[in-house]
């Protein structure tokens, strides 16, 4: 069977569904529809479009283009917050609290034309807290819980939303964190409650639907096949430049490359570095790249007695050939980095100090002996080609180096959703995963990677990587809080620098590299709009 025929066959049911909706998607011709952006992307990790539950960057990218937020990062400056659902806001604060009052713009409507107001948004925000799923942590870390949510979120009228915080949290941090969060989506309460099952407030419905105010609506989602977004006819803002966004699930980079070369798609999202270099040198394909605030991590489960030992965790860092990886596998993919704060964020250690480790097998052996494992041990590494395509070859490199000091790693491969399930259930020894900073402020990394509000298994704090790894250090918790409330910018930056130096020696992770976000596209894409968050603005993309 030739490749084209295979591609068409594998996506036939999704294509049929798209055709049934009246959309013409060319699978084998040289042009995609002028009003449609067609992307190829590995969508293995997406399991829901519920703002209360979604916890993967792929689904999040789609959701923030379907559901508007109160505020959003500017297209040309990720650190600048600009109005969205809110046309303006006021901040009042003292030594005890912070209050932010948002004034909603006129003309907000759901996709079917019904008006949306502040009470709908308050319900949506409370829903996140009450469902106690992954993104509840976004509110919890600012002191908003099920016990005080009615007082914290209020709507004095249809156009006003008031958020009250019981500590003097920096308003700029809250705004930048919430700007990239899914938690401030204005949901369609009427639709969701019609589809409520056993008190889930529409959670199961949102596994395959959207119901919110935004420029696009989710027309179709077929796991393993693709996503179709259609522009909303009742959107309050400027109409999207393109009427439809079709995201095809294409797992293999080689297949994505073939589709892109033939112009059967407009954009490829998962190409390998060698493919990108070759395409740039030999074709008309354009490549866009930005260093993103995202890190790839090798995590250690501290509930496992072996990895509860700090010296074992430190020994693992000396098994990583940072220099070799940087020159080969990670070239044009990312920057080797052992710090939890990405380059570009406040207080981030520079490139040299942020990566002090090197491959040192004698040092690793010494630490293992001091930890009580002179003959090594057996453990597993969980990794997957999706959504981290370089995790498997890095894991294999680690496996080879570990053998030389007596550590016997078994590599187990999983697809994205399985990998996240293992992470959330703490059912792993070591695991590869990624973490993206939700703002330009380092607290949003420290608050999830270091801080742990409750390490009990029954707490199910799956929004915290620290909890997923069973890591709780009360001293480090306090240092995270102290840095958060430090008002002097220079002192605050120094506190984060010190926190990085300490955490890279004792934390439950070995940070591997900070990633580049790289996208390849045909010349048909005339305007690609994103910032360094990176936030991609589907509605502003032009062909």
Regions from the language model: what does each represent?
Residues 39, 222-225, 369-439, 489, ...:
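Ligand/substrate-recognition segments at binding pockets and active sites
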Residues 40-93, 126, 209-215:
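N-terminal lobe/hinge region of extracytoplasmic solute-binding protein
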Residues 74-76, 179-240, 244, 362, ...:
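Gly/Pro-rich hinge or "lid" segments in bacterial periplasmic/extracellular proteins
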Residues 103, 140-194:
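Surface-exposed binding/hinge segments that line
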Residues 204-207, 232-278, 408-410:
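Ligand-site clamp/hinge motif
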Residues 335-370, 387-393:
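Structural transition elements
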Residues 357, 405-419, 424, 447-522:
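Extracytoplasmic/peripheral linker and loop segments enriched in polar/acidic and small residues
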Residues 458, 519-543:
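Long beta-strand-rich cores associated with HINT superfamily self-processing modules
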């Amino acid at each position: 069977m030739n490749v084209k025929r295979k591609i068409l066959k594998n996506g036939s049911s999704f294509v049929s569904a798209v055709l049934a909706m009246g959309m013409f998607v060319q699978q084998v011709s040289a042009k995609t529809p002028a009003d449609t952006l067609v992307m190829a992307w590995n969508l293995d990790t997406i399991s829901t479009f519920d703002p209360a539950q979604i916890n993967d960057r792929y689904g999040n990218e789609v959701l923030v283009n379907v559901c508007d937020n109160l505020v959003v990062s500017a297209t040309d400056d990720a650190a600048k917050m600009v109005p969205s659902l809110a046309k303006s806001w006021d901040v009042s604060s003292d030594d005890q609290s912070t209050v932010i009052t948002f004034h909603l713009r006129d003309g907000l409507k759901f996709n079917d034309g019904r008006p949306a107001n502040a009470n709908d948004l308050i319900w949506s925000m409370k829903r996140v807290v009450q469902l106690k799923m992954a993104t509840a942590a976004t509110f919890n870390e600012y002191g908003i819980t099920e016990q005080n949510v009615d007082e914290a979120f209020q709507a004095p009228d249809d156009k006003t939303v008031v958020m009250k915080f019981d500590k003097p949290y920096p308003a700029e941090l809250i705004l930048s964190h919430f700007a990239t969060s899914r938690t401030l989506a204005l949901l369609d309460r009427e639709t969701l409650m019609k589809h409520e099952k056993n008190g889930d407030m529409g959670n199961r419905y949102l596994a395959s639907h959207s119901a919110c105010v935004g420029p696009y609506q989710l027309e179709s989602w077929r796991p393993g096949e693709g996503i179709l977004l259609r522009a909303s006819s009742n959107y309050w803002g400027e109409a999207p430049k393109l009427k439809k966004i079709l995201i095809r699930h294409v797992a293999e980079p080689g297949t994505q490359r073939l589709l892109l070369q033939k112009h059967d798609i407009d954009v490829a999202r998962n190409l390998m570095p060698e493919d990108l270099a070759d395409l740039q040198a030999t074709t008309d394909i354009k490549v866009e790249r930005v260093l993103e605030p995202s890190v790839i991590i090798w995590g250690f489960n501290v509930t496992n007695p072996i990895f509860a030992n700090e010296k074992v965790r430190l020994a693992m860092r000396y098994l990583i050939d940072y220099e070799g990886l940087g020159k080969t596998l990670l070239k044009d993919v990312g920057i080797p980095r052992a710090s939890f704060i990405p380059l570009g964020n406040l207080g981030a250690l520079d490139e040299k100090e942020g990566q002090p480790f090197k491959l040192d097998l004698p040092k690793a052996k010494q630490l293992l002996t001091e930890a009580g494992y002179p003959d090594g041990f057996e453990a597993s590494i969980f990794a997957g080609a999706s959504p981290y395509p370089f995790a498997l070859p890095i894991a294999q490199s680690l496996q080879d180096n570990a053998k030389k000091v007596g550590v016997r790693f078994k590599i187990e491969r999983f697809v994205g959703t399985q990998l996240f399930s293992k992470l959330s259930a703490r059912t792993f020894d070591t695991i590869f995963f990624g973490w993206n900073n939700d703002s330009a402020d380092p607290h949003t990394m420290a608050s999830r990677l270091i801080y742990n509000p409750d390490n009990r298994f029954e707490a199910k704090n799956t929004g915290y990587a620290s909890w997923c790894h069973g890591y709780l250090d009360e001293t480090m918790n306090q240092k995270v809080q102290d840095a958060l409330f430090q008002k002097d910018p220079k002192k605050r930056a120094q506190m984060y620098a010190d926190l990085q130096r300490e955490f890279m020696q004792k934390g439950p992770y070995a940070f591997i590299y900070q990633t580049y976000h790289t996208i390849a596209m045909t010349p048909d894409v005339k305007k690609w709009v994103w910032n360094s968050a990176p936030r991609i603005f589907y509605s502003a993309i032009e062909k």
